[in-house]
Each structure stands twice: as structure tokens, then as C-alpha cells.
Amino acid sequence: MTDKNITKDAMYDAVAPDDFESMLELDRYNNRSSAFDKIIAATHDHFWDPLDTKYIDFDEPFDMENEPLVPEEMIAALQTDYVSNHLSDPKERTRFINTMVLHNFSSILHGEQGALNLSASLCHVLKDQGAQEYAANQTREEARHVTGFAKYIKTRWGRPLECGAVLKDLLVEIIHAPEVYKKIIGMQMLVEGLAMGAFASFYNNIRDPLGKKLLQLVMTDEAFHHKFGKIWADRTVPKLDPEEHAIIEDWAAHCFQTLLFNLVSPTQQMALYADFGLDGMKVIEEFQKVMTDDVRRESMRESANIFRVLIKTLLNAGIITDRTRAFYGMYVDMEELKLEGDRMVGDDIAEDGIRYLQAINFKDRVVESIRVAAE
């Protein structure tokens, strides 16, 4: 247990990645935490294989040339007169929308790869056997997400886009961080929270049945991954001293701001705009005119808004204090958010997905319905 890791519960005790000798301590074998047992046992309920057509068939067609994957209201740049007027041809407009979706799905794919590597790294540093088994299970699940999104992108577009510099830098920072709290807050709570918000938003709007099914299958896993971070917060945050809380709170705000910039900043799509004959700087200028604080706050009221999910995650975990409350208050009504309770957007979608998977995996047995990430 080290100050740098800010460990407040033995089940999150960690060692250096190259300290395998600590894993051979005899007392460690008899001190397995039971905190993750229900999440581990539930892996059978939400198992799926992206390479097995009984779960998902990537040969399902969709007219990418003539049908937009999502409503154009989801494409921020199209809310500007400059971009909307420039893309007057229906086919070119559709191509622009679907290319913007490719940008988002490519970011998701890179994020899933980051989650895979981070989960594997946790197996090397967490001492508790239960925590290790959970991390090993998540590693396997993230691997199928990488396969699933890679196959979907190949089917619909052929090839993903490069990982944006901002997202790449954050993923590298989280994965290489020696501090366990940085890994858990950065990935298990924020990147996974971002994923749940993004998946729910796309699930509710995507017109491609194949994309919709993939999103639901992935969400059945992500709901449990998000729970791992919540368990850490429940057992850690109440025991923090003011200095430790400030360290964790500042790290969370740093990750949030980075993810916000990566997703909504038009500077992240400059090359994409150029491919459509658009002046990237002009797009940014027009975007800033329409994206006022009032517009931003109103869009955040929608429960499926991606960053609303992130802020709610941090608020419910007790990480946000008066030090950073005003920062998050620029995007949401914090009092309104607090009154919503613990239920997260995407939970219902994930639970429906689990029932779908139970029907496939246990069709010869009567199974009890389960709630997502049960306590």
C-alpha cells in the first residue's frame, strides 16, 4: 500500500508492474476479497462472441451511399449555415454524416483498445485475487469489443480513422500511469462512462440495425466495467483526507476536460472538413457562434447526453466538491442532476441485452432475470 496509489481498501492494494515476487506471498492467497464475486459470476450471463452469427451477423446490409446512419441533428457541424449550405447535394450530405460517424466509431475503437491494455495492466499490479480475476475477465471482454467494432467499421467503411492526438495522449497517460487511482478514475469511471453515454446516444439514434445490435451487446459488458469503478469510489472516496481528495478531484477534472475537447472540438476534424471542400477555420468560427452556453446547457439536459453521464458518475461517486462544482456547472444543472438518483442512462438497454444473451446462452435452462451490475 503506497501513498502514491491512494489505496484505502486492501482489495485495491497494488504493487509495481515488475514486482511479481509480491504475488507469491503466501498470505495473499488466503485473502481474496468477495467484493467482485457477483460481477465475476455474471460474466456467463452476458457472454457473446462477435465471430458467431447467432449473436451478431456482420453481413447484414445497409445503404451507406443513400441513407445517413444518424439524424443530422447529431452532427454538430451541420447546425452551422456554412456547412449545411455547402453540403446541399443529398449524397454528399449523407457521406459527410456517415464519415462523422466513422470518426466517432474510430474513437470508440481506439478507446476499447485502451481499455483492453489497461485491464491487462491491472492484472499485473492489483494484489487481490478477486480484483485480478475481475480485471482478467474485463480484458477478455474488451478484446471482443475491439473485434466487434473493428469488424463493424470494416463492413461499413473499410478502415478506421487515426486516433486523434488528444485522445491518444490521454489513453497513453492513463495506461502508463503507475497510480492505480489514475487508472480506475481515468478508464473505469470516465472513459467507460463516456462509452456508456456514447453508446446510449448512438443506440437511440442509429438507423443501422447491425450497429444498434453491436452497441447493445457492448453495453451489456460496459455496465459491469463501470460498476468496478463505482466499487472503488464507494470504498475509497469517503476515507480520503482533503489533500488526497483534491488530487483525485483534479485528475478527474483533467480527464473530463480532455474527453470533452476530444469529442466536441471541431479542431479534431480539420482534415475531415478539408476532404469535403470545407474551410476548417471557417467551420470553427461558425460553430462557436451557434454553440452558445445556453445551447450547450440545453443539450446537456437530455439524459443520453454523453457528458451528462460523466458528470453524474463523478457526482454520485462523491468526487466533485465545491472546488470543481462551478466547472461542471457550466454544462449541467448540478442540483437537478443530484436529484436524479443512481440510475444511469444505458442501464435499461444493457438489461434488455442481457435478457437477449440469456435466451441464447441458456435456452435450455430457466434463468432468473438479473439486474445490471447487481450489488
Predicted regions and their residues:
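Short, charged, amphipathic alpha-helical segments
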Residues: 133-136, 213-216, 246
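Active-site-proximal binding-pocket segments
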Residues: 195-240
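Active-site-adjacent scaffolding segments
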Residues: 149-202
